[in-house]
Amino acid sequence: DQVTKFFVMDNASSFATGIQILPIFDLVYVQNDGVSFGMFGGMPWWGLSALALLICAVLGVLLFRSDNRIEAVALGAIIGGALGNVVDRFRFQAVTDFLSFHIAGLYWPAFNLADVFVVCGVGVLLLYPVWDARRQA
C-alpha cells in the first residue's frame, strides 16, 4: 500500500489529470481528508487516526483470540489496511487515493489498496459464516 502511494505521490503531476488504463479505470491523485467515499471530510486528521487506532486495537484483540485462520486473515487484512491509511494521516493529514472506476459518466469515489484490504477483510468476515454453514449442512 505505502509503496503504491509513494509512486503516485512521486508522480503527482502526471496523475493529477488522470491516466486512463482502461475505458472504465483511471489512475488519479486525490488527497482524501475523510474516510471511505469522503465521509467525515473536514474532521480533524488526528480524530480519524485515533478512531482508526482504537478500532485496530479492538480488532487486534479479536485477532489474537481467534482460532479460525480465515477469520484471522480477514481481521489482519482490515487492520493492515486501516494502519496503512493511518500512516498517511500522520504523514500528510489525509489519505492518498488513486484508483478510479467509472462507467457512463458515473464515478465511484477514488480509493487505494489499503481500502481494498479493509473491504475484502470485511467481506470475508460477513460471507465466511454463510459459506461455512452451507458447507457443514
Language-model region placement:
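Alpha-helical transmembrane bundles and membrane-interface segments of multipass inner-membrane proteins
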Residues: 2-137
